[in-house]
């Protein structure tokens, strides 16, 4: 299995990265760190726009090319806890495991550099900026042509929602799309004592908010899991003034592109209809985000066979889809591939992703590294 020195280096790298987190789109020092490591391994650096970084290793056959990806950005969260390698950047922390993903792919890069004579396919190593925001780093890299000559792409996520010792994925839709919305309701304000002389946008907004859920229950195919959530309402300035306008801000999650289209069209129709009934007007804006993550069936089967053969049948887990999103989906829209969860839920990883006390379990690093190595060794 994986060399202990390789794992030790991965842990050291992860802890260094954890101490020096950078926000999405600002990972320039992280990029410099990765570049220095790859250059020390004599791995070619391809010409892609920083702060993402892409390495390339030519295989002995070179008739196939696979890409491996790690995201490198941190979150705007104040870390809680007293570990000796806590974030040194106040208000910024690796609370999703991207420090681990980066360290794991660096370890795999080192293995590749030391075993080039035994590696048949070409390898593209993607260290990707800005997974946590939109427009995302994956979308930008795809537009820049990072997958131009790639046959398949693979990525992992250290996953707190899966038990430690399990590794798994799901063929087909595995993670949801995310599209945000802003609904602006224009009414007619006035004094709070005379509501009959106004068109109260707050009152109208309450009807819109409650009615949005009817789209999920009555307009979307029940076989297409979907969510509409309102996260913010903005309106008014004080207690005795009915305002002119109200804004409703929220998010749409679904595993189906068809459901996205249905939800958006129905939101516009429903909102405009309700507003018209009350004498108000509405403007509905959508902020298009990450598409659903859909694993390729063939590559999923390939990964499942590797997990079962390498780690044992009891390690593989066929996962349930989740309504969280992941911009790895942009790669999978372009090329076949698979996104894989490496479970780590347990005593060392009890808090969920994006929690101020989130922690990854470094004991799962050997399996994650080995998984990538086996994908490289067995891809044909």
Task: State where each predicted segment sits.
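General structural feature for long, well-ordered alpha-helical segments within catalytic domains
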Residues: 2, 6-13, 26-37, 64, ...
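Metal-dependent amide/peptide-bond hydrolase catalytic core
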Residues: 206-380
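Conserved hydrophobic/aromatic beta-strand scaffold that supports enzyme active sites
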Residues: 54-56, 182, 339
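Divalent metal-coordination and catalytic microenvironments
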Residues: 17, 55, 68, 98, ...
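Acidic/His- and Gly-rich active-site-bordering loop/insert found
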Residues: 1-94, 99, 103-119
């Amino acid at each position: 299995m994986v060399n202990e020195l390789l794992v030790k280096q991965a842990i050291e790298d992860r802890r260094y990265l954890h101490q020096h987190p950078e926000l999405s789109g600002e990972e320039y020092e992280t990029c410099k760190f990765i570049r220095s490591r790859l250059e020390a391994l004599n791995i070619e650096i391809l010409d892609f726009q920083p702060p993402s970084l892409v390495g390339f290793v030519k295989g002995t056959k070179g008739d196939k090319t696979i890409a491996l990806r790690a995201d490198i950005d941190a979150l705007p969260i104040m870390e809680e806890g007293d570990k000796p390698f806590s974030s040194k950047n106040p208000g910024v922390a690796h609370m999703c495991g991207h420090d681990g993903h980066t360290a794991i792919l660096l370890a795999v890069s080192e293995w590749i550099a030391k075993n080039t004579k035994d590696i048949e396919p070409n390898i593209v190593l993607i260290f990707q900026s800005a997974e946590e925001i939109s427009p995302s780093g994956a979308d930008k890299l795809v537009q820049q042509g990072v997958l131009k000559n790639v046959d398949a792409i693979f990525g992992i996520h250290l996953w707190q929602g899966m038990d430690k010792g399990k590794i798994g994925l799901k063929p087909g839709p595995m993670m949801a799309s995310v599209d945000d919305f802003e609904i602006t309701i224009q009414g007619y304000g006035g004094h709070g004592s005379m509501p009959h002389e106004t068109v109260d946008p707050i009152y109208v907004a309450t009807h819109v908010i409650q009615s949005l859920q009817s789209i999920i229950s009555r307009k979307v195919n029940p076989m297409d899991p979907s969510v509409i959530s309102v996260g913010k309402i903005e309106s008014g300035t004080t207690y005795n003034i009915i305002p002119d306008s109200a804004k409703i801000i929220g998010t749409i999650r679904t595993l189906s592109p068809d459901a996205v289209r249905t939800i958006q069209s129905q939101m516009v129709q429903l909102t405009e209809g309700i507003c018209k009934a009350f004498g108000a007007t509405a403007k509905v804006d959508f902020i298009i985000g990450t598409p659903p993550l859909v694993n390729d069936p063939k590559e999923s089967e390939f990964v499942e066979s590797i997990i079962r053969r390498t780690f044992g049948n009891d390690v593989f887990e066929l996962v349930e889809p989740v309504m969280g999103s992941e911009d790895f989906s942009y790669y999978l829209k372009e090329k076949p591939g698979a996104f894989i969860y490496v479970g780590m839920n347990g005593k060392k990883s009890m808090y969920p992703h994006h929690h101020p006390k989130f922690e990854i379990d470094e004991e799962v690093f050997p399996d994650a590294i080995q998984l990538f190595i086996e994908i490289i060794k067995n891809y044909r």
